[in-house]
Amino acid sequence: MPPKRPDADRFAYADAARLLRETLDALLPPTRISVAEHAARHRWVRASSGAHLERYDHTTAPYLRGPMEALTEHGIETVAIVGPAASGKTAGPAESWLLQTVHADPADVLWFMHTSDAVEAYVKSRIEPMLEAHAKLIGDLRYGRDSVAMKRFRGGRVEFLPFTASSLINKHVQRIIADEYDAYDPALGDPIQLLNPRRQAAGADSRLLAISHPDLGVPITMPPERQRGIMRLYANSDRRTWWWPCPHCGAFSSPNPGTARRMLLDYPEDAPLDAVEQEARLLCPVNGCVIEDGHRHAMNVAGRWVCAGESIDEDGHVTGAPVFSRTAGFW
């Protein structure tokens, strides 16, 4: 009885044609394309209404383009994104970076979340559907059988892990995603001090993306050493803030605390919560214009990030030089 042919799905190099193709591909340099550009060209996402897929559109959440660009920006080793829940900071930059890594710039990746349950839920609900939706793009790059915790691709692998002491042992990669950074067990110590050695061997080619709601932060006016969690990373970064124009007078201001011209919410303080939600408005700090929520999308499309060390005038002109930091911080 002749021996059975090896299962190509289990043994990546059982197929001679595949072996030859991948050997030749390995000699080619990685495609130089930013995460933002890759998402615009190649990524598909589920439509907000209906079950069909549509092209990733940067105008949906324009403020996420900056963090995506920073992931391939020369001289940047860490990207810290501070923001509220459900603002797209994981679905946008993190997932797009994963897809760009697999398709265009292979490397080993560690993706940490705060618990095993969170890892399993996220991989099953977000990562696996994303990979399946891009089968035509990356199908030939996937290797055999994988699991919730491990996805193998040509030129690299992605491990999805809870942030625990055992998960950090003997892990050395080029890229790390630290999701829900402020939810990590504080008994383990400062997360960045535990994560940096995991990418030390990659040197300046390493990248770490940290994402979180600022649950551990103290007021931004406090010195960096007093900050904790994601806000400590931000305080030691180039501290980029988001600026957008008033839809009525055109003057640029920022919703971020501590900025020179801060746009605030105006609402009836003693009213019931339902009334507050209905009546809350933004106030332009330059001319006092009342801004309805319906203008926010157009304001974001026209918005931009401004680094510490730079100044932006009311007309949107930026002057000055950004402070030097190998961490790009977005808040």
Language model feature labels by segment:
Residues 2-331:
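Phosphate/NTP-binding elements of NTP-utilizing enzymes
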